Amino acid sequence: ECIGHRRSCKEDRNGCCKLYTCNCWYPTPDDQWCKCLL
């Protein structure tokens, strides 16, 4: 499992999530967080 700050799920394709399912939630209007799960 990998958790990281991302501006969007699409951008995270270049990060740790690229082989996993990316679930995003929005702690603030200006930020998104991705949690990558197997």
Curated annotation (Swiss-Prot):
It is found in: Secreted. Expressed by the venom gland. Coiled coil: none annotated. Keywords: Disulfide bond, Knottin, Secreted. One of its GO terms (cellular component) is extracellular region. It comes from the Eukaryota. Disulfide bonds join C2-C17, C9-C22, C16-C36, C24-C34. Its main location: secreted. Belongs to the neurotoxin 02 (plectoxin) family. 09 subfamily. The presence of a 'disulfide through disulfide knot' structurally defines this protein as a knottin. This is U9-ctenitoxin-Pk1a. The lineage of its organism: Eukaryota, Metazoa, Ecdysozoa, Arthropoda, Chelicerata.
